[in-house]
């Protein structure tokens, strides 16, 4: 079965993306976290950062007019929504010395394990490479960890996210080098297709 089309997210997609994030957490987190952790994550992790859409670094997959997967990358300092509002969150990263961030990956429960997460990660890698980045980092919740490992991310450390309501959620800091292009410039053509 072919993947549903991927495109860059736009501001009018925000309500549908937020709904998908919330539903994905409620669907998938109970397999990894308890009821309190799932409920807290639905409030504080399933939160769309509009800066990703404004920066044109956030992708969606649509099937039958509905967004079924979303995720992206950032060239800014903020690593994840739950990281709080630090003074330098919006700072642009230096691609020569700092890694790009993979951000806010969510797949609707009935669309998991069909390649959508991988397709978004591939789009993120192409776009970050085109901007000169050499590495990707992310803060994974436990439901996403298997996808990231399968894509070649390695664990840096395990850590605890403390939500604003005091609930703690186990997470994993991960990284992956961005592979250099081998021959031709197919990557720039692929990146151009992602933005169409």
Regions found by a protein language model. Give the residues of each.
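A short beta-loop-alpha structural element at the N-terminal edge
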Residues: 5-19
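Conserved acyl-donor/pantetheine-binding loop and adjacent beta-alpha core of acyl/acetyltransferases
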Residues: 55, 62-64, 68-112, 127, ...
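Short loop/turn motifs at secondary-structure junctions and domain boundaries
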Residues: 49-55
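Small/polar loops that bind or transfer phosphate-bearing groups
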Residues: 9, 103, 139-140
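Conserved acetyl-CoA pyrophosphate-binding loop and the N-cap/start of the following alpha-helix
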Residues: 111, 115-123
């Amino acid at each position: 079965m072919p993947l549903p089309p991927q495109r860059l997210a736009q501001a009018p997609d925000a309500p549908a993306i937020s709904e998908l994030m919330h539903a994905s957490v409620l669907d998938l987190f109970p397999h990894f976290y308890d009821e309190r952790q799932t409920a807290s994550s639905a409030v504080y992790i399933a939160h769309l950062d509009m800066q990703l859409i404004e920066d044109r670094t956030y992708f969606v997959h649509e099937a039958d007019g509905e967004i079924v997967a979303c995720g992206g990358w950032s060239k800014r300092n903020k690593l994840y929504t739950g990281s709080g509002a630090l003074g330098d969150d919006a700072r642009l990263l230096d691609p020569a010395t700092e890694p790009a961030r993979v951000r806010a990956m969510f797949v609707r429960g009935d669309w998991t394990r069909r390649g959508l997460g991988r397709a978004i990660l591939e789009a993120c890698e192409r776009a970050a490479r085109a901007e000169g980045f050499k590495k990707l980092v992310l803060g994974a919740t436990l439901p996403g960890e298997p996808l990231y490992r399968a894509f070649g991310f390695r664990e840096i450390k395990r850590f605890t996210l403390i939500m604003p309501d005091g609930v703690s959620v186990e997470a994993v800091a991960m990284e992956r080098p961005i592979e250099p292009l081998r021959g031709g410039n197919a990557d720039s053509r692929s990146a151009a297709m992602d933005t169409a």
